[in-house]
Amino acid sequence: MTINPVSRKVAWLRVVTLAIAAFIFNTTEFVPVGLLSDIAESFHMQTAQVGIMLTIYAWVVAVMSLPFMLLTSQMERRKLLICLFVLFIASHVLSFLAWNFTVLVISRIGIAFAHAIFWSITASLAIRLAPAGKRAQALSLIATGTALAMVLGLPIGRVVGQYFGWRTTFFAIGMGALITLLCLIKLLPKLPSEHSGSLKSLPLLFRCPALMSLYVLTVVVVTAHYTAYSYIEPFVQNVAGLSANFATVLLLLLGGAGIIGSLVFGKLGNRHASSLVSIAIALLVVCLLLLLPAADSEAHLAILSIFWGIAIMVIGLGMQVKVLALAPDATDVAMALFSGIFNIGIGAGALVGNQVSLHWSMSAIGYIGAIPACAALVWAVLIFRKWPVTLEEQPH
């Protein structure tokens, strides 16, 4: 199915709008990390108790990514995007109105449903809508939108929450989604499904040991990162005893360092993806081990967060590149699985951080996170040695 030829300008506008949508969807997943203390205060709960909604959201996305992709595989893509945006916006209005924590969690589950469908179709849509010969650039634009969610979305969401209340943050995300939806309605042509959501490719993917090993690495390293990252805002305020404003600065630094990470990966990723990912995981181990010692000063935490941000961005980009390289004929299913597995890691990390904070001490989140990070480092070295060629990005 080819789309009627359009000007390059219109084609790029379509891809950019999708990238903005990716930014919005990822911002709403990450933004509660910066709002945990405020949400806890408004519902008279402990921060660690509120943190469970990070796990619920991530695991709903993880469990529903593949089923939703298959359920909607025959649906015309423009109509599907409109439907999932309506669900996304309505759920944000419910988040804004949430009269108790249960209602807030229900609204987040609605958002997670939309998120699960969105991420299982976005990569293939970007490729279809891209100007001729610009598929790789279209995919990197979507990745940039995703990366900017951590760089800008999360800190801006936190600033809005700090000054206008956390409800306003969710309302603003909903309004951003509404504007994006209107742009998509105007810009997108009819996009008949290309039946990309087929289970036939699943057995092939499961029979690829390099890919399965990569999925295991993903879940372990993401669990390590989110064990500490999910609770970084209350950690800065309650353990380090620093101000709410500094917590915002730290999130901005951590996200902003991701830009450096993506530049490093963009320059060296094609040839040295395995080495880069291994070095980044080693850097993550060091950052997690030093989190508590660094809490003695703002400068130490700031420096640590820069290295942490670089490491996690390189890891995320490296994993995506490798998954796409190992499953060139089943990118939709492979990426839906990757998204699901990534979210299992987010949920698991947030849950471990939650349990450590509730039953032990929030000061230990870095040390506990370093345990799976060390395991991930050993696993990465082993699998990159075993499959050195197939794990490198295929030439375009």
UniProtKB/Swiss-Prot annotation:
Alphabetical list of InterPro entries matching this protein: MFS, MFS_dom, MFS_Efflux_Transporters, MFS_trans_sf, Sugar_effux_transptr_put
GO cellular component, one term: plasma membrane
Gene3D superfamilies, per database record: MFS general substrate transporter like domains
Residue stretches spanning the membrane: 15-35, 50-70, 81-101, 103-123, 136-156, 169-189, 202-222, 246-266, 275-295, 301-321, 333-353, 364-384
Subcellular location field: Cell inner membrane
Keywords: Cell inner membrane, Cell membrane, Membrane, Sugar transport, Transmembrane, Transmembrane helix, Transport
Highest taxon listed in the record's lineage: Bacteria
GO terms of molecular function: carbohydrate transmembrane transporter activity
SUPFAM superfamilies the UniProt entry points to: MFS general substrate transporter
UniProt entry tagged with the keyword DNA-binding: no
Bilayer disposition of the protein: Multi-pass membrane protein
Pfam families xrefs: MFS_1 (PF07690)
CDD domains in the cross-refs: MFS_NepI_like
Function: Involved in the efflux of sugars. The physiological role may be the reduction of the intracellular concentration of toxic sugars or sugar metabolites.
Protein family membership: Belongs to the major facilitator superfamily. SotB (TC 2.A.1.2) family.
Database matches in PANTHER family: PURINE EFFLUX PUMP PBUE (PTHR43124), SUGAR EFFLUX TRANSPORTER (PTHR43124:SF4)
NCBIfam families the record matches: PRK03545.1
HAMAP family: MFS_SotB (MF_00517)
The name this protein goes by in its record: Probable sugar efflux transporter
Annotated organism of origin: Salmonella paratyphi A (strain AKU_12601)
